[in-house]
Amino acid sequence: MARVKRGVVARRRHKKVLKAAKGYYGARSRVFRVAKQAVIKAGQYAYRDRRVKKRNFRALWITRINAQSRAEGLSYSRLIAGLKKASIALDRRVLADLAIHDKTAFAAIVAKAQEALAA
């Protein structure tokens, strides 16, 4: 049986990993063994942080909504309860956008929520 020389395959694999590690600091971008670990770890961070990003944005939206709704005289939790009671189905991303860019529309929504809570 013929001997298998894997020079081409190994070179291709090494090039792929080193290309993925381009821009990393020091040996992480030059030494295959270290670069391979760095690329794997970067992939783990990317996977985790794609999920964390969703949590962070939701927290940011809630903070923005709370700040603006308190300026209108209603806490965040009361606002959300009022919106549910008034069956206004706006998600937090849209509410946060309105709170920042269209304060009059947001004030109208808060007023609707207050009416629903009073009823």
UniProtKB/Swiss-Prot annotation:
The keyword Ribosomal protein applies. The keyword Secreted does not apply. GO terms for molecular function: rRNA binding; structural constituent of ribosome. Keywords: Ribonucleoprotein, Ribosomal protein, RNA-binding, rRNA-binding. One of its GO terms (cellular component) is ribosome. GO terms for biological process: ribosomal large subunit assembly; translation. Binds directly to 23S ribosomal RNA and is necessary for the in vitro assembly process of the 50S ribosomal subunit. It is not involved in the protein synthesizing functions of that subunit. NCBIfam families: rplT_bact. This is Large ribosomal subunit protein bL20. It comes from Saccharophagus degradans (strain 2-40 / ATCC 43961 / DSM 17024). The lineage of its organism: Bacteria, Pseudomonadati, Pseudomonadota, Gammaproteobacteria, Cellvibrionales.
